[in-house]
Structures are given as structure tokens and as C-alpha cells.
């Protein structure tokens, strides 16, 4: 039997479009073969190239491979694996952070500029051969070359970066860097824009607020500052028991003598961070803690002008610092609170967790309680337990309607805490933590950006935001207005009390700072 195969389907006829594409592909294939043959010939000719041509081409190739800078959070995350190898570091998980106090605040973690100066974040305690010392008594003169993800790029910039790796410590009366500037007001001869615009009419302000009987506080000295970040969530002003004022302007900390009103020196960290986000003096010495936008917590001795150590672990902006003897607590915008024992090499001794950004940290005067304020409106009271784990339970959690940033413990009455409400609240809250209730809640009709207690006169001073932009003094225990200072045109972001408790340093978003008598 014979089998015969027959075509059942009709013969397919190619269309003009298919024929056109086949023609195009043939041309492309031919061009590709010619290109490959030419490249092979060029490779053979390159054997005769000079060394200068090879060096020039190699340099051009390196310059084209510059890594793109990212935000501080991303940069720290990329280096988490490297920093885990350091004996002076620990990890922090990332979380989504929402900052509701949006009016006029710098709420985003990325810096003001589109680029970020990249610096090495890895620093080991036992690497003296690399020029870094991390002990409590040794000086740290150099930091590592700027870090980059590409190995070739790191090697190409290392030689240039070695000339500018020193942390700058400048000593002069008027300190000026690219980051900022502090200068005493020259009164009638002053050409500062804020002074040329004229002085605010305090009497009109008092009449409009109904407080004509209040006393008007006069400034002892007025200072012009540039580089102050208009960020509601930072804590960049502190006055030490040695009568030294520290204020962060950009990526530098300026040390100012509170007695003779002269600038002493500054600490410039522009090589390692975008800006400084918090400062805090230790109570028992001249050590200054500095938190940065890159998540570092550095300790500086302003007498010896040496950096004592650099404590890593945070992956985001460190916006709050608070001392309890030798325990330093730091809070970040990723909601982590770390306890550091600065006396030991393994400094990380405890962790507390929040769901949102930490805006404020304050240890009570007796050191038994820690209060933390968050951007989600939660005021949390923690027990004294530096070794707390991530599952540490708070003593109390009090819900507020706005972010809890302005906060301070009463120095003469145990368990009393004052917090300032944000723009949507506008109230000063005096809380009895032991009873878990509010004692007084007077309305300020404005955002409260900062506050401090005045023990000499048993009063509270609050730094107001929009629309008042002044400093209001409240008498306790009635919490009624008794006076104010009206020398600022921008919201008063920071307040700090002198060691003798008779003067207040105020810094505002309009680029002015004042020292005024409160006693």
C-alpha cells in the first residue's frame, strides 16, 4: 500500500509588509557584520597605541562613572552591610515616616540641594593604622576618604580627598563658613535686612492680644545668624553649665561664649554630613553630642578640640538628643530611640521603638523617666532602663492632636511635664504624669515651636510660631500671660536657658537670635 502526503492547507503568500521587514533585517545584519569586523581591526591597531593615550582614555572612563548621590536614608541603607562589620555600630530598620506638622517645616529627609557630599560611614574602634582612633581619650584628626559604590571611583578620588579630610576647628570672634554665620548686631549702624525693616510695634501687639498690662522683655544682645534651618523637627540649640552656647547652622556647630558674647570656635562637618540636626551638652563636662542628617551621633570635646568618638546605627536624621549622666539617648526620623553608654566601646545598650518620627527626647531632672514626642501625636513616658530591648513597654502613652515637639520637665515639681501644641492645637499643655491628666491647657492661638521652664521666677517661656512669632512668658501655677519678647519676625524655633537661670537664648526662622533677661 502506498501512502501519499497531500497539502491540505493553501500555500501561504507573503505580504508586501513581510517582505519589507525581511529586507530591512538583511540590511541590519550586514551592517552589524561590518561593524564587528571594523572593531576587530581597531583592537589589533590598539596594540600600537601610546601609554599617554591609554592613560587619557582611562581617566575619561573613570569620570563618566561617577555615582549618583542619593538621599541620606538611601545612602545609609546601602552602607548597612559595611557598617555592620564595625565594632562601634548597630542596625536600624527602615519604616515609613509621616510628619504632619507641614506648615513651613522641612519635612523631607533629602537635603536642600540635589546632591549630597558622600562620606565614609564605616569607622572601627581598633583601626589606628588607618588614621582613626575611637577611644575616649584619643584625638580623631582624620576621617576616611569619601565613600562610593564603585571601587575605581573611590581610588581615583582618594588622592584628592586626602588634602581636605580634617574636621575644621576655627577660633575667631566672628566665625564664618559657607554653612552659616554669627555676628553681633551693630544697633543703629546695622545693615542687616531684619534691622532695616524696622522693629516690631510691641504696644500694638499687646493691644491686639488683650495683654496691655504684660511686661515687654528687652534683649541683652541681638545676633544675626545665617544658615539656620527652618525645620520644626530639629533641636539644634543648647546652653551648657560651662556657659557655652552651641547652635547648628547648616553642617557646622558654632560655639558661643554666653558671658562675653564672643564666638569661640566652630565644628565643621560638611565633609561627612549634609546638615547637623541636633546638639546637646553633657551635664558633667565639656562634651558636646552632635546628631547629623546621615544618622551619626558624634561626641566632641570643645576644650581639647578633639572628636572623641562617632557612634553609628541610625539610618536617618537624628533629630533629638538627651543626656542622663553618661547615657545619651538619640531619636531618629525612622522612629528609633537608642541608648548609648559613652564610657564603653560597645556603646549601644538599649533600643526603644516608635511607629513615626521622634521629634523630642527629654530625661526628667531626677533621671527616672524619659519622655519622647513623635510626629504622630503620641507622648510616651518610658522608665529608666538603658538596657531596654526592642520590646520595652512604656509606662504611659498620651495622645495629642498634633506632633509633640516642644517639651520640657518641670525642674521644681516632680512628674509635671509641659508640652506645646502644633498649629492645629495651639495650646500649652501642663500634664501631671503620675495622675495621667492635664493640669492646665491655656490657648496660645498659634503654633508652639519651643518651650522652657524658668525656675527663678516659676514661669514658662514658649516660642510661638505663626501667626505671632514671639516669646510668651506664663506665670505658674495659674498659667497666665505675664510678659513677652517681640524681637523676632519668624517663628521662634529654639529656646535655651543660661546656667544661672536668668537669661534665655532664642533663635528664630527670620535669621535672628537674641539673649534676653528673664529675671
UniProtKB/Swiss-Prot annotation:
Tissue distribution: Expressed in multiciliated cells (MCCs).
Record's protein name: Cell division cycle protein 20 homolog B
GO CC term, one of those recorded: anaphase-promoting complex
Subcellular location: Cytoplasm
GO MF annotation terms: anaphase-promoting complex binding; ubiquitin ligase activator activity
Organism in which the protein naturally occurs: Homo sapiens (Human)
Pfam families: WD40_CDC20-Fz (PF24807)
UniProt WD repeat ranges: 229-266, 271-310, 311-341, 353-392, 399-441, 443-484, 487-519
Main location: cytoplasm
Reported function: Protein regulator of centriole-deuterosome disengagement and subsequently participates in the ciliogenesis in multiciliated cells (MCCs).
SUPFAM superfamilies, alphabetized: WD40 repeat-like
InterPro entries assigned to the protein according to its UniProt record, in alphabetical order: Cdc20/Fizzy (IPR033010), WD40/YVTN_repeat-like_dom_sf (IPR015943), WD40_CDC20-Fz (IPR056150), WD40_repeat_CS (IPR019775), WD40_repeat_dom_sf (IPR036322), WD40_rpt (IPR001680)
